[in-house]
Regions:
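The feature captures the beta-strand-to-loop junction immediately N-terminal to the Walker
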Residues: 94-96
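Helix-to-loop junction immediately C-terminal to a conserved catalytic motif
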Residues: 109
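Conserved ABC ATPase "signature" region
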Residues: 164-179
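Conserved ABC ATPase signature
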Residues: 183-187, 191
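ABC-family nucleotide-binding domains
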Residues: 218
Length: 259
């Protein structure tokens, strides 16, 4: 029996329907402007041109000095890590899988105890409990941090005293206001991710850590999240972003920490 060859071609789905089909050559010839208008991500990965994170210091911001962390009491994932993030900066944390990016984020927000080293905020050393009060982490799997029975209720947990207008403004910006009564577990993966970003924005905590915040997002939603993170920095927040997304990194971040 002669085997049949299956040839797949890219298609563009809009509002749940296939609205356009491309040949491979047509798809590769799309200009950046056309691709962005369609909400598609880049096909190429440009090298990172951002400057490195600043060394540890005693001034304003978050300073990490000689940090050593292990996961589940195993051998240290990284040793004597030092860097700083100033208010108004967005620092990307990048590196191969397994080098400790998520471990670092969990340690900085007080979910994991360090083996050695010091974490300072505005020059003052922070213990684990103090870091839990000062930092908010949006996890890569946001299902572990959505607890309410509605989108609105989830935001209210993070900001119990916020005016309704403020919550509505944040949800509207992230294209979630029309889902305000929806159960978080009934949202799509990208919508859950944006809801977690909304709760971080509303938390008013000075240190915000995002673990792969653009995972699964198309170009338009990635730009929205990038804009929100830039706004947080302009408000004087200290922002770290764990990411493999080079397109997002170049749009949203000021410096990069390579692990």
């Amino acid at each position: 029996m002669k085997a049949k060859r299956c040839v797949c071609s890219p298609g563009y789905i809009r509002q749940g329907s296939l609205s356009r089909r491309f040949t491979r050559e047509e798809f590769q010839r799309l200009t950046d402007e056309e691709r962005e208008r369609l909400g598609l991500r880049t096909l190429s990965s440009a090298p990172c041109t951002l400057p490195p994170a600043k060394p540890a210091g005693s001034g304003e911001g978050l300073s990490v000095e000689g940090l050593t962390c292990a996961f589940q009491k195993r051998e240290a994932v990284f040793r004597e890590l030092s860097f700083s993030v100033r208010p108004g900066e967005v620092v990307a944390v990048t590196g191969p899988n397994g080098v400790g990016k998520t471990t670092l984020s969990r340690c900085l927000c007080g979910l994991l105890r360090e083996q050695a080293g010091t974490v300072r905020l505005h020059g003052r050393p922070l213990g684990r409990k103090e870091r839990q009060r000062a930092a908010f982490c949006v996890m890569q799997d946001v299902n572990h941090q959505l607890f309410s029975d509605s989108v609105w209720g989830e935001c209210r947990i993070s900001a119990p005293d916020a005016p309704d207008e403020k919550i509505a403004e944040v949800l509207d910006r992230l294209q979630l206001l029309s889902f305000r009564e929806r159960h978080p577990m009934a949202l799509s993966g990208g919508q859950k991710q944006r809801l977690a970003v909304a709760t971080a924005l509303l938390s008013e905590k000075p240190v915000l850590i995002f673990d792969e915040p653009t995972s699964g997002l198309d170009y338009a939603r990635m730009v929205e999240v990038s804009g929100v993170i830039r706004d947080l920095a302009r408000q004087g927040r200290i922002v770290l972003v764990v990411t493999h997304d080079q397109e997002f990194l170049q749009q949203a971040c000021d410096r990069v920490l390579h692990l």
